């Protein structure tokens, strides 16, 4: 009995280790895509709208889960900020979108809810969370809802691309 149990535990450990390594590799590639595509942003007020971030948030939400999505969004935002291609406002927008989109997909397994979760998480929650950062840390004058429209526009652009890309990836069982 002990031998069978130990064999089971070893197989389970190897399988979990393989899954973790795969997820880390995918997250690394998504972070690299986010950093390399950073010049593809457009300024709206104090923010730099970056639809590619929302595309990779949705890919991470669907294929990696909310935990990896949030960590990936944080690292991408940090690297974009360090290279001068992002702002502090990227943190709440990308991380809230990845979290809400990831949780929506994790509990429903429905792609449309991942898309809506990303839009809501970034466009509403992330935009409202960006307000104190803009006002108190960046010293910008802004109304409470000033970032909602730019964040929704940015998120919608990435979501439209993600609809086609994630659907294709799901159909090919990637």
Where are these regions (language model features)?
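Loop-helix junctions at membrane interfaces
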Residues: 1-174
């Amino acid at each position: 009995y002990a031998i069978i149990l130990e064999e089971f535990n070893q197989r389970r450990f190897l399988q979990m280790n393989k899954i973790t390594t795969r997820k880390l590799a995918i997250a690394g590639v998504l972070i690299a895509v986010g950093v390399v595509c950073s010049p593809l942003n457009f300024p709206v007020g104090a923010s730099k709208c970056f639809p590619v971030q929302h595309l990779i948030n949705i890919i991470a939400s669907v294929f990696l889960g909310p935990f990896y999505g949030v960590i990936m969004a944080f690292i991408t935002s940090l690297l974009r900020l360090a290279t001068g291609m992002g702002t502090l406002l990227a943190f709440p927008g990308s991380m809230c979108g990845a979290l809400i989109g990831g949780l929506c997909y994790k509990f429903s397994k429905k792609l449309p809810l991942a898309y809506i979760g990303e839009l809501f998480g970034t466009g509403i929650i992330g935009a409202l969370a960006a307000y104190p950062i803009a006002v108190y840390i960046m010293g910008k004058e802004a109304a409470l809802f000033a970032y909602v429209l730019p964040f929704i526009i940015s998120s919608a652009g990435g979501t439209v691309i993600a609809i086609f890309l994630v659907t294709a990836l799901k159909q090919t069982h990637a």
